[in-house]
Amino acid sequence: MAAYAQFGYAGYPTANQLTTANTDSQSGHGGGSPLSGTNEASLSPSGGSTATGLTAGPLSPGAVSQSSHHAGHKGLSTSPAEDVVGGDVPVGLSSAAQDLPSRGSCCENGRPIITDPVSGQTVCSCQYDPARLAIGGYSRMALPSGGVGVGVYGGPYPSNEQNPYPSIGVDNSAFYAPLSNPYGIKDTSPSTEMSAWTSASLQSTTGYYSYDPTLAAYGYGPNYDLAARRKNATRESTATLKAWLSEHKKNPYPTKGEKIMLAIITKMTLTQVSTWFANARRRLKKENKMTWEPKNKTEDDDDGMMSDDEKEKDAGDGGKLSTEAFDPGNQLIKSELGKAEKEVDSSGDQKLDLDREPHNLVAMRGLAPYATPPGAHPMHAAYSSYAQSHNTHTHPHPQQMQHHQQQQQQQQNQQQLQHHQMDQPYYHPGGYGQEESGEFAAQKNPLSRDCGIPVPASKPKIWSVADTAACKTPPPTAAYLGQNFYPPSSADQQLPHQPLQQHQQQQLQQLQQQQQHHHHPHHHHPHHSMELGSPLSMMSSYAGGSPYSRIPTAYTEAMGMHLPSSSSSSSSTGKLPPTHIHPAPQRVGFPEIQPDTPPQTPPTMKLNSSGGSSSSSGSSHSSSMHSVTPVTVASMVNILYSNTDSGYGHGHSHGHGHGHGHGLGHGHGLGHGHGHMGVTSNAYLTEGGRSGS
């Protein structure tokens, strides 16, 4: 109670006092009540009223006595007129106090009830009663008969103690107020009554500061974070940096002290300032406004200090390649473009050197530039890229003259050519490097038509494996086809003046010479010897062949590698009418293997899968009939490409190991294949055994 008396709360009873005072309070008269101090009316915050039933109810400094609403507890509130004895109540207060309504709890005002952490009592958190505040009083404000002290708002405290709440009514320094305990009374009076009051939330004057007052000495705003600093440079901040840069164009390298000064002025970090100057120097250099000598090779020693957000910013506005390094026309960085041009030049040199050394893999593999004219077969376009017109080359190569001796079939060939000119691919015989413009014109078309892969116009002729694999129908390699593509009509269709590729002839001249005397007398194939000289036999000698060599797939179909099956008699004689020479084309190789991609062949090139074995056996027989020739390595290798019993049509496909297949089938085979090769009546690129060669 000392605390209550000290702070003017003498009117609030303790629990034990209430138990003894129940009888007196029920009488309705407060005279001599132990609840009062020197004067009930003056010292009781309730204006002289007495309260009962507060042993377990919520305590509140409200003007009206409160009791809990718990069942079993009854709170009796009496107006001041009932409790006041005589004229103890001042006149000014009596009229106002009589107007106060009887209340059960201050929490009816909507204020929450809190639980005292020490005593466990439920305490209403409202410190002020609205009715009392209406008459300008604080709940602890003393009435005229009370002791005089320092009031909260200039009013008197009923205590001799000078304001036990230092934070109320006293403008303490903002620096130390948060460090002081405005509820220090708990230390002096640890009674349960006071512990309940100390839990009540009294706002201190420092609560109006939204930031730690200890930061006030630095003059920063309440929302200023010392750690974050400025995250993004603004125009205002960079204006200072730009001004400094414009004044130091001769030497745009601020010293450490200048950077620190600028960082303080702009409220930026030192790293941001350094990065800004590094980017500014780079920007001026790109704009050819560089008016200083670079310090070192990297031109900027501050680039390494660039922060992540500045790097992103620089990449957004200044990170684009300038036209000095990037050629928008060719979509290439100039350094890469230069490499591509060098490759083009070197490829041009290769074309000039083809007569001496056939290094170009496009021709050796039968790889065509992937662009094809809309109306032409892909392989036709592939080879027509090396020469513009397939009917205009009338200048046979000297080496080819010896292979075009039989020309009496020319009329038949021309007729067949008209029928099958566009049905199946044929090798365009205009030599390999005769028209560079034709080749590049075809290559300038991107792969997008067949593969969906754009290729720069400067792409060299030597295509990579990746390009081949990416294409829907990669061109079959020369190991499978050879490069002598002829219209699918018949071997006799070949015009005698169509030249053979020079480098093929040079590479395999020895094989050709060995086989020139093996040509079958009945066949007038214009390129029989050359067929063994074709890249297939050459490539087969590599023992690897091409990846597609054993796969009779859409690739072989697209190449026109279906040989019309014919009886051994027709193949041996080759004198039947063209219609007999071209029965239904059949599939070559192993029919059960199919490619992953659907065949992209014209409807006219669809294969007839029937009769493969019979035709192959027939061709094998015919090949055995033709001649027995010395077995060459190329023929041996071609065993790889033909079935053991068929040697399908290798006979036809220009000696691409055709004969070899035959030899396998019958055991005589290899030599026969050569005979075939020279003599195949059909010039199809398809595998010949079947074509009845």
Curated annotation (Swiss-Prot):
Chain intervals for the UniProt region annotation (Disordered): 20-104, 288-331, 387-453, 480-538, 561-627, 648-693
PROSITE patterns reported for this sequence: HOMEOBOX_1, HOMEOBOX_2
Location relative to the cell: Nucleus
GO molecular function: DNA-binding transcription factor activity; DNA-binding transcription factor activity, RNA polymerase II-specific; RNA polymerase II cis-regulatory region sequence-specific DNA binding
GO biological process: cell development; compound eye morphogenesis; equator specification; imaginal disc-derived wing vein specification; muscle cell fate commitment; negative regulation of growth; neuron differentiation; positive regulation of transcription by RNA polymerase II
DNA-binding region as annotated in the record: 226-288
GO CC term, one of those recorded: nucleus
Entry-linked InterPro entries: HD, Homeobox_CS, Homeodomain-like_sf, Iroquois_homeo, KN_HD
Origin superkingdom: Eukaryota
Location, primary (coarse class): nucleus
Other notes: 'Caupolican' is named after the Araucanian American-Indian tribe, also called mohawks, who shaved all but a medial stripe of hairs on the head.
PANTHER family with a match to the protein in the record: HOMEOBOX PROTEIN ARAUCAN-RELATED, IROQUOIS-CLASS HOMEODOMAIN PROTEIN IRX
Protein name: Homeobox protein caupolican
Source species of the chain: Drosophila melanogaster (Fruit fly)
Gene name of this polypeptide: caup
